[in-house]
Curated annotation (Swiss-Prot):
Any one GO cellular component localisation term in the record: cytoplasm
Name assigned to this protein: Hydrogen cyanide synthase subunit HcnC
Any one GO MF annotation of this record: glycine dehydrogenase (cyanide-forming) activity
Influence of pH: Optimum pH is 8.3 (in the presence of Tris-HCl). Active from 7.3-7.8 in the presence of other buffers.
Enzyme Commission identifier(s): 1.4.99.5
Entry binding sites for FAD: 7-21
Keywords: Cell membrane, Flavoprotein, Lipoprotein, Membrane, Oxidoreductase, Palmitate, Signal, Transmembrane, Transmembrane helix
């Protein structure tokens, strides 16, 4: 069976779904979303944090990973302190701050639009994010963060011990205080992806679940379609690579070059439902916590280089639970509902890979978002829509182009139409 579309989007996670929705809003394109639903979709590894500043300065998964590496380095240095300075990893460059803040600003209107036009509610909540300071190294890390973002001083607030206790009564009284990010909020990650896809479907996008791209067709330098395992050949003029942790494989098929995207495993814990315990999202050097609208608390997340493995492991889950209980002692009496793992699409510099490549016309990247896919999904969809329509972009995407990696050509043959 052969079908013809203007655009094929490979990947139905939150990034591909956002692209599908934004591109479908004009009603002038025939679009298909191809998604294999392989285990480990990155949306599964997310707390749903819209932590525009928090993620940009390395909180959430970033500070957990930093403290893990810090502990290892300290052991190797036989107890010597680890410096927190300008070389500290995970504080992302200014270009990402711009991307993140612009994306964050889109969510209130996006939330209203998806509810009113499509009946889909992804549970946007204005919660703020607090980095709970539990020891001197946490404070040093927090001070370093503040020093890096003087231009965002109005969005950051120090809470002393008493102020933290008033804001979050459940937090351990041993905590020294917190650094609060006022514009960082949360959504339900699963409902966000579903909302994008359902709205896109209502706008006429064809969803092809359980379908995998097995080859890419080209006429000379131009994309002309894809081969799939279950839906035959899908002819198109534009292919968007939103394949998440599998994006490198699709890039190689489409361009002959393998972009440096690899899976980064994140394990997650979910509690039973309970009355409101947390007033906002919390992150520590051990874990992050977000209580959802149904009362469940999501606790995450590890950062592991384990290939495509999505199994849960006791030491890592126990570490998350212990970190959560250290911060919020009442959680010691709470039952765990389930655990799981997802695969974030990591890039070497932790920045997404967006936009065209010089070698192939009609191919666009929308991948490599690592731990910020939920946050940046809104702006990614807008950017891809404007790229397809050759319109002015709201920000410079040069820092996010695949060309920054200068990958070597792969020894593959690209199928001809």
């Amino acid at each position: 069976m052969n079908r013809t579309y203007d655009i094929v989007i490979a990947g139905g996670g939150v990034i591909g779904a956002s692209c599908a929705y934004q591109l479908s809003r004009r009603g002038n394109l025939r679009i298909a979303v191809v998604d294999d639903k392989r285990p480990g979709n990155a949306t599964r590894a997310s707390a749903g944090g819209l932590w525009a500043i928090g993620e940009s300065v390395g909180l959430g998964c970033g500070v957990i990973f930093f403290r893990m590496m810090s502990s290892r380095n300290r052991r190797e240095a036989q107890g010597a302190a680890v410096a927190v300075d300008a070389s500290t990893p995970h504080i992302l460059p200014p270009a990402f701050f711009d991307l993140a803040l612009q994306s964050n600003a889109l969510y209130p209107e996006l939330h209203r639009e998806l509810i009113e036009r499509h009946g889909m509610d992804f549970k946007f909540e204005r919660t703020g994010l607090k980095y709970v300071i539990q020891d001197d190294e946490d404070r040093q890390y927090a001070e370093h963060i503040v020093a890096q973002i003087p231009h965002l001083a109005e969005q950051v607030r120090w809470l002393d011990r008493e102020e933290l206790r008033r804001a979050e009564p459940a937090v351990s009284h041993a905590a020294h205080g917190a650094l609060e990010f006022l514009c960082d909020h949360q959504v339900s990650p699963f409902r966000l992806a579903d909302a994008y896809l359902e709205a896109a479907r209502q706008n006429g996008v064809e969803l092809l679940p359980g379908t995998n791209v097995t080859g890419v067709l080209r006429q000379g330098r131009r994309i002309s379609g894809v081969r799939t395992d279950n839906a035959g050949v899908l002819h198109c003029r534009t292919l968007i690579n939103a394949a998440g942790a599998w994006a490198a494989e699709l890039s190689e098929m489409a361009t002959g070059r393998r972009i440096p995207v690899k899976p980064v495993k994140g394990q997650i814990v979910l509690t039973e439902r309970m009355p409101r315990l947390l007033n906002g999202c919390l992150t520590t050097s051990d874990c992050y916590m977000a209580q959802k609208d149904n009362g469940e608390i999501l606790i995450g997340s590890t950062t592991e280089d384990k290939g495509f493995d999505v199994s849960n492991t006791f030491p890592e889950i126990a570490g998350l639970v212990q970190g959560a209980v250290r911060c919020v002692p009442e959680l010691q009496q709470v039952n765990l509902k389930r655990t799981w793992a997802g695969l974030r699409p990591g890039s070497p510099d932790e920045l997404p890979i967006l936009g065209p490549v010089a070698e192939v016309e009609g191919y666009l990247n929308a991948c490599g978002h690592f731990r910020t896919g939920i946050l940046t999904s809104a702006i990614t969809g807008v950017l891809l829509d404007r790229l397809v329509h050759e319109e002015t972009l709201p920000l410079d995407i040069a820092p996010f182009l695949a060309a920054r990696f200068q990958p070597e050509p792969a020894a593959v043959a690209v199928a001809a139409c």
